[in-house]
Structure formats: C-alpha cells, structure tokens
C-alpha cells in the first residue's frame, strides 16, 4: 500500500462464498499496522488467514489504471494487477489521478504498467481519448516521467498511450483494433499464437513454453480458454492504413516491430530508449489475455505471466 494511507484504519474487502462468514468483520475499518488474523467459517469448516500490509513509500513498479482503487478494476485488469503485486517486488497500484496529482512518489520507479481492457474494444485515437480521460489528463506527468528515464509496459488498449506522451514520431495510434465482451468471450478450440520471426532472441520471448518444431510461434492459451480477442495492432499493407510496408511504419512511428499476426500486422513493438528517455514495450495482440470466464488448466497460458516477467526484467535492467 502507498505509505500515504493510514494503516491503522484500512477497510478490507474480502470475497466470501455463499454462507461463509469472516471474523473480524468484512468492510470494517481495521488496524493493519501489525499482521491481522482473519478466520473464515463455512458450516463446520474454518480456515485462518494472516494478512500483512506493507507500506511502500517509493515503488519500483506501478500498475496504473483508471479507477481510484484496484478493487474497481474489471476481471481482466485485476488478474494482471494481482499478478504484478505478487511477483514484482516493491510494486503497488495507483490511479491516473494519483499520478496527475503527484500522490505517488515515482522517483525510484523503474516501470509503469497499464493493461487496459474495455468490453467491445477501443478503436482509434479519438475513441481512446473518450474512453480514458483520466489517462489523458495524466499525460503531462507521465511524459515528465518518461523524459527523465522512466519506462513503460503498455498492453492491450493501453498501447494507444505512447502517442499521448510524445513517444510516437507521427503521433499515431494502432490502426486496427477490436474486441469482444468478457461475459460472452469466445471459447477457443485450440491454443492461439502470434509470430516472432527475426526476434527470437529478444528478452521478451526467452524461456517460454514453446511448441516443438515452431521456434517462431508463441502460444498463449489452451483449448477451451475463453478469450475476448481484444486487439490493438498496426495493419501493414498497401490496401489501407497508411503503412505500405514495415520500413515505412518504422520510419514514421519511430517504433521497432517485435511480433506479428498471421496477416503480418505488428502485434508487439517497442520504442527504444533515446537520450534521457526511458523504454516503452507494447503488446497489442489479442493472444495476450489474462482472464478466462471459465477456469481452464494452464499450459501455454503460463507464457502470459512469463512474458510479462520478461518485460519487467528487460525494462528494469537493460
């Protein structure tokens, strides 16, 4: 938790199954200055959980999003955020309003991650600015962070954000975007993948679970996984979109392509560090998905967490 919060009076929100109760009571101001023990009871069964809250003054990594509290994130975003808090040391959640107002001390922050999901998709720069005004309002503070060496991981529709902080040479955003609703997400019949030919040695793609005989394919989900196919990519081709080929896209945007869809669209890319500026990694592939409505045993889906860990390592240490 940010050290600006009073640990002596935090209000816990605890999810309980039907007929279960918890003591101390849920939703009541509680003193977390020391570890707190909660007892959950359901009929004759009971379990004891100890919660320790750590106050963080200067985070190393921040998951940023639109709501004031991470409890207000949708399921896709919340799953990603919880993973970060559990796996990236000295990390915390902050809202864009927190960033704008300077509530969070970013002086030692190496990476800010925004994973943005919106049911139905976010198609185009104007649609992005309408759907995420809090992010746009924080652009000045984020630009200062970036210009002073701070790095970003932008995933899904957050890949529109580099244009808002002056990172894209032509001020453009992904030109080929769509997505489904979480509640009626598509059930895949087999694993989905994207392609990394020419970039297999990039740190983002190391130590993943690979399919035998397919060194250029990254698989990210398993059969029966429910996926919204939420995509924010760059169409490349002479038919439409303004980027006849990859060289033109690279020259006009200043970005470097890292991964591709089956039609050659750019689905992962980066803006290398230049001068005093930090690095930016973007993943806009519909295959990059954290949450399935139906619980499915994970094999290839473990690549999502591993790839994200790789991203943090790359942005923090290279």
Predicted regions and their residues:
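A glycine-rich, often tryptophan-bearing local segment used as a flexible ligand/cofactor-contacting loop or short
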Residues: 124-229
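Catalytic beta-strand/loop cores that center a nucleophilic Ser/Cys/Thr
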Residues: 186-285
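Short, solvent-exposed loop/turn segments at secondary-structure junctions
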Residues: 68-69, 118-119, 159-161, 264-265, ...
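A short acidic/glycine-rich loop-to-helix N-cap element
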Residues: 289-308
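Conserved beta-strand elements of the Class I
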Residues: 60-62, 281
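C-terminal alpha-helix
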Residues: 310-318
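Helical hinge/lid and interdomain linker segments adjacent to catalytic or ligand-binding clefts
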Residues: 62, 66, 70-171
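Beta-rich interaction/scaffold domains
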Residues: 1-59
């Amino acid at each position: 938790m940010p050290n600006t919060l009073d640990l002596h009076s935090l209000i816990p929100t605890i999810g309980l199954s039907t007929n279960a109760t918890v003591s101390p009571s849920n939703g009541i101001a509680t003193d977390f200055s020391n570890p707190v023990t909660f007892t959950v009871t359901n009929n004759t069964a009971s379990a004891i959980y100890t919660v320790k809250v750590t106050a963080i003054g200067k985070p190393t990594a921040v998951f940023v999003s639109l709501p004031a509290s991470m409890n207000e994130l949708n399921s896709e975003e919340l799953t990603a955020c919880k993973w970060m808090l559990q796996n990236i040391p000295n990390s915390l959640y902050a809202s864009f309003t927190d960033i704008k107002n300077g509530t969070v001390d970013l002086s030692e922050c190496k990476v800010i991650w925004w994973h943005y999901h919106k049911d139905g998709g976010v198609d185009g720069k104007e649609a992005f600015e309408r759907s995420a005004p809090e992010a746009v309002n924080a652009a000045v503070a984020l630009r200062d962070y970036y210009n002073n060496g701070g790095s970003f991981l932008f995933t899904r529709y957050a890949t529109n954000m580099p244009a808002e902080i002056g990172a894209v040479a032509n001020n453009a955003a992904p030109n080929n975007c769509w997505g489904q609703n979480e509640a009626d997400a598509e059930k895949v019949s087999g694993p989905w993948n994207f392609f990394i030919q020419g970039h297999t040695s990039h740190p983002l793609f190391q130590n993943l679970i690979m399919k035998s005989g397919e060194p250029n394919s990254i698989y990210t989900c398993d059969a029966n996984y429910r996926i919204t196919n939420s995509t924010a990519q760059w169409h490349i081709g002479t038919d439409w979109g303004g980027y006849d080929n990859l060289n033109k896209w690279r020259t006009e945007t200043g970005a470097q392509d890292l991964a591709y869809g089956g039609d050659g669209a750019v689905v992962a890319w980066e803006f290398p560090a230049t001068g005093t500026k930090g690095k930016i990694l973007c993943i806009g592939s519909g295959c990059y998905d954290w949450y399935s409505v139906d619980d499915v045993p994970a094999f290839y889906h473990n690549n999502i967490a591993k790839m994200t860990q790789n991203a943090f390592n790359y942005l923090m240490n290279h």
